[in-house]
């Protein structure tokens, strides 16, 4: 089994009435938040119209409470750049009313994200040396700038910010899923260690910002992922770091228009975004956020420059990166080995942070730079899939 998240998401079957916004449906058996929905407004919705819509929703909330729908109403509001919307608990009649508002683009059920069990075994980290040597090698070769002055947003299961790997460079950003500011699965800490750990990391001087969207069972709603992206954009903008930030999401699943749209806004704002291609050995075009064309979608390679057997493939993939038997940090101290495209994506985030610091490129141009530096070395990458492997441009 391999390290990756799965979003049980949505098809494009419309349940809406004529001239109403689409209400996207979920496949049979999908796990969703009971009566939970994500509402996305049209791109041209003004701030004033959005405010008026929210006032109207507040009145609906009052009526739903009177009808006995406990906990009903808006739970999260998204208002950044070209994405305005919200998520919450609504009954069927209310959703029909919402979809009939001409300012609403679409409505989709709030699906549950779940974490897969990951492979763990002790083995030396080979990924760092591979990405800094064209023909492979045992040493990691890098510039001493090492990601200095760059922030890495890890949208995941949390990060053990006190781990010695981070040398005080990790901070807690936001928790959008529970009240436990810890990493209950170990996945987020492992990812952060690959990006910026002193031993296992690529950008060894970058700052890590933990954005928790998955609980100790490795689960959380799609609305929480969107909220995590929203928070990261706002936080980076507040500190003047949008073009000096990378955002990693080692998660994904079937197509979600809302998640793709939110992810694209981070890149438009100036950030680099890396995401996992997926672990089902299928075409990743049907997955989100991997199918969002503006993100850097990363597939997993092996020690021998082959496609990892579990890795997704397809034209949405931008690069391959090491994703098999990757050693990195573990919560509470020490290390552990994991495999998956979840491990490949942070390699790309780390190299992006490294190049942002070394070359001064803006974050949202880093994916193009990664592709320019990459090497066509992957054997049997899959149909209509790039053979290019991540490389940091060390000259070796």
Swiss-Prot record:
Any GO CC annotation of this UniProt entry: extracellular region
Prosequence residues removed at maturation: 21-116
Region annotation Disordered: where it falls in the sequence: 376-396
Keywords attached to this entry: Glycoprotein, Hydrolase, Protease, Secreted, Serine protease, Signal, Virulence, Zymogen
Inducing factors: Expression is moderately increased during growth on protein-rich medium. Expression levels are the same whether keratin is present or not in the protein-rich medium.
The UniProt record lists the keyword Chloroplast: no
The keyword Hydrolase is assigned to this record: yes
Domain Inhibitor I9: 37-113
Cross-referenced CDD domains: Peptidases_S8_PCSK9_ProteinaseK_like (cd04077)
Glycosylated residues, chain numbering: 63, 230, 248, 392
Range of residues in the leader sequence: 1-20
Subcellular location: Secreted
GO molecular function terms noted in the UniProt entry: serine-type endopeptidase activity
InterPro entries named in the record: PCSK9_ProteinaseK-like (IPR034193), Peptidase_S8/S53_dom (IPR000209), Peptidase_S8/S53_dom_sf (IPR036852), Peptidase_S8_Asp-AS (IPR023827), Peptidase_S8_His-AS (IPR022398), Peptidase_S8_Ser-AS (IPR023828), Peptidase_S8_subtilisin-like (IPR050131), Peptidase_S8_subtilisin-rel (IPR015500)
Composition bias type Polar residues, residue spans: 376-389
Protein name: Subtilisin-like protease 5
Organism placement in taxonomy: Eukaryota, Fungi, Dikarya, Ascomycota, Pezizomycotina
Recorded name of the encoding gene: SUB5
């Amino acid at each position: 089994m391999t390290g990756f998240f799965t979003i049980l998401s949505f098809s494009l079957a419309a349940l809406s009435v004529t001239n109403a916004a689409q209400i996207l449906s979920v496949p049979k058996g999908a796990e969703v938040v009971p009566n939970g929905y994500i509402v996305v407004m049209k791109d041209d919705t003004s701030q004033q119209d959005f405010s008026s819509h929210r006032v109207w929703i507040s009145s609906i909330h009052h009526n739903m409470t009177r009808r006995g729908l406990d906990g009903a109403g808006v739970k999260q509001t998204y208002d950044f750049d070209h994405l305005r919307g919200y998520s919450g608990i609504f009954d069927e009649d209310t959703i029909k009313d919402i979809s009939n508002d001409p300012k609403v683009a679409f409505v989709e059920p709030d699906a549950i994200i779940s974490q897969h069990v990951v492979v763990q075994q002790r083995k030396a980290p080979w990924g760092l040396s591979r990405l800094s040597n064209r023909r492979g090698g045992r040493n990691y070769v890098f510039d001493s700038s090492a990601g200095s002055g760059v922030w890495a947003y890890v949208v995941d299961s949390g990060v053990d910010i006190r781990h010695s790997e981070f040398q005080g460079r990790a901070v807690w950003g936001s928790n959008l899923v529970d009240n436990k500011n810890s990493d209950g699965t170990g996945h987020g800490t492992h990812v952060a260690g690959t990006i910026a750990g002193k031993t296992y990391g690529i950008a060894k001087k970058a700052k890590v910002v933990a954005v928790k969207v998955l609980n100790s069972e490795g689960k959380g709603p799609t609305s929480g992922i969107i909220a995590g992206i929203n928070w990261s954009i706002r936080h980076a903008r507040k500190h003047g770091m949008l073009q000096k930030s990378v955002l990693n999401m080692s998660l994904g699943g079937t197509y979600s228009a809302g998640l793709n749209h939110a992810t694209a806004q981070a890149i438009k704002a100036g950030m680099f975004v890396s995401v996992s291609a997926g672990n089902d050995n299928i075409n990743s075009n049907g997955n989100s956020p991997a199918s969002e064309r503006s993100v850097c979608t990363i597939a997993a390679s092996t020690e021998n420059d082959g496609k990892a057997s579990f890795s997704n493939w397809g034209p949405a993939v931008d690069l391959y990166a090491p994703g098999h038997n990757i050693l990195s940090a573990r919560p509470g101290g020490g290390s552990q080995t994991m495999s998956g495209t979840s491990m490949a994506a942070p390699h790309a985030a780390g190299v992006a942070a490294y190049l942002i610091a070394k070359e001064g490129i803006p974050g949202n141009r880093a994916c193009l730079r990664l592709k320019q530096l990459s090497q066509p070395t992957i054997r049997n990458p899959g149909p209509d899939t790039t053979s290019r492997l991540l490389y940091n441009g060390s000259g070796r």
